[in-house]
Each structure stands twice: as C-alpha cells, then as structure tokens.
C-alpha cells in the first residue's frame, strides 16, 4: 500500500496535514489543495493521520440506483452505471435474512443509504466504497438471531 494515493490532480501528493477543520494536501508541483474535513470520512482534527493514508476524493457523490442481494454477495448498482459488490458475510443481518427480507429495502438520504426495515440494517454507500463491513458486535448479532428465533417460534405456535 502506498503512503499516499494519487488524487488525479496532475501531480502526486507529497504531504497531507490537518489544520483546524481543513485537510491540506501538498502536491509535487507545489500546489496545495484544501479540503474541508467533513468531506473526508473518518478523520477528525484531534486525531493524527495514520502513517499510511489513502484518500478517496470524488467529484460527485455516487448515488444508489438499486440493490441485488444473492446468497453470497451484496451488489449495489449506482446511478452512473457502476456496480459495487461485496461479500454478504460482511453484513450478518443480510446473510441471515430471508430472500423476501433482503429484497425489501429502501434507498434513503441522498440516495446514499440502503435501509432494510425488516432486518433493522442500514448500509452507507461511502462505507462500502471504503471497503467497510458491518461493525455490529458478535454479541449483538447473537441477540438479534435469538430474537428472530423466538419470534419465529411464536408465529408457529400461534398459527
């Protein structure tokens, strides 16, 4: 992994620093690009930048068009024609959901959040672009699975 990734500004970054609420990127050609920190995910002005920093800078935020969930992958189709795919195992609630539950989703926000109300799961597009998976704890998943089992048993007993 390189220390800094190319920003496609005609020159390679040579230094990245945080000053106040701005990210300053100094380029090899001497130019400095200033980016508001709120545009850069998971950085704050109080935390030092990690030794190896990669930046993903987008001209326009991507938008979700539709979603297709298979038994092994979450496939997110973007409005610009691209498709983003990641392992379904990254999202345990989707992995354990039924086909009907997986297919019952809404695109929220500015077309950048996918919400499955039946599974109580939200996936942010930016998190997928960063290669991030669910951060829900194993304990929380186990409680959720147990509550599903209890609800399923109650339906069978009532029916």
Give residue spans per PLM region:
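Motif-centric detector for short Cys/His coordination patterns
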Residues: 1-159
